């Protein structure tokens, strides 16, 4: 990731902003994703928080919920219909006469949808219920073939049977705790989660999930 073909390439050959600020109080990760992708504030792009209250049904639902879309590989229905502003990926599509390829992938549906914008070829997320890569019928072509292959050939059990602990002795790190610590004090095992949903939720909070996406 940190080699010549990783982040260094993005910094040296891409567009890189080392110091970017938005003058608002964060309403959650979805609000932040929308602000970063549109370059504007929540008052303009409409994503004010992770959830909103639907008065008709009296339910609290995800901000990207779309009753007209159907989940593919997921029971969740999501699309960018509630995003009022264009993202830079939308502008990229327009400026290249739709020749650019735009795919977004994230650990949860709302972030994937907002990162992709309105014109993405596909937004992909890791579904908590199924443990599979999923998308929405909003994207006409559905899941890319490599996602289908991964869902068929790859068992998430191989990654969710994780043990998360320090790679080296704690005292060798730059900022060790002032308290007497050991690797045992920072040890997380997936085996304690018997429920698959809880297991995947815990997995999403580890570096192994970042490696997956």
Region spans (language model):
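His/Asp/Glu-rich, glycine-adjacent segments
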Residues: 41, 49-213
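Short, structured active-site-proximal loop/turn typified by the sulfatase FGly-forming signature C/S-X-P-X-R
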Residues: 2-45, 101-105
């Amino acid at each position: 990731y940190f080699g010549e073909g990783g982040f260094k390439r993005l910094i040296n050959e891409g567009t890189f902003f080392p110091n970017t600020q938005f003058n608002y109080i964060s309403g959650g990760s979805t609000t932040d994703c929308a602000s970063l992708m549109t370059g504007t504030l929540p008052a303009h792009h409409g994503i004010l928080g992770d959830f909103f209250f639907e008065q008709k049904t009296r339910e609290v639902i995800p901000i990207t919920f779309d009753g007209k879309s159907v989940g593919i590989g997921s029971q969740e229905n999501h699309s960018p219909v509630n995003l009022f502003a264009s993202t830079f990926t939308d502008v990229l599509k327009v400026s290249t006469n739709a020749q650019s390829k735009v795919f977004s992938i994230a650990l949860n549906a709302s972030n994937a949808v907002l990162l992709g914008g309105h014109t993405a070829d596909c937004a992909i997320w890791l579904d908590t219920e199924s443990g599979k890569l999923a998308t929405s019928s909003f994207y006409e072509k559905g899941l890319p073939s490599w996602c289908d292959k991964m869902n068929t050939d790859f068992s998430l059990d191989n990654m969710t049977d994780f043990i998360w602990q320090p790679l080296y002795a704690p005292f060798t790190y730059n900022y060790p705790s002032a308290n007497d610590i050991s690797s045992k004090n920072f040890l997380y095992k997936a085996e304690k989660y018997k429920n698959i949903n809880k297991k995947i939720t815990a997995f999403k909070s580890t570096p192994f999930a970042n490696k997956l996406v």
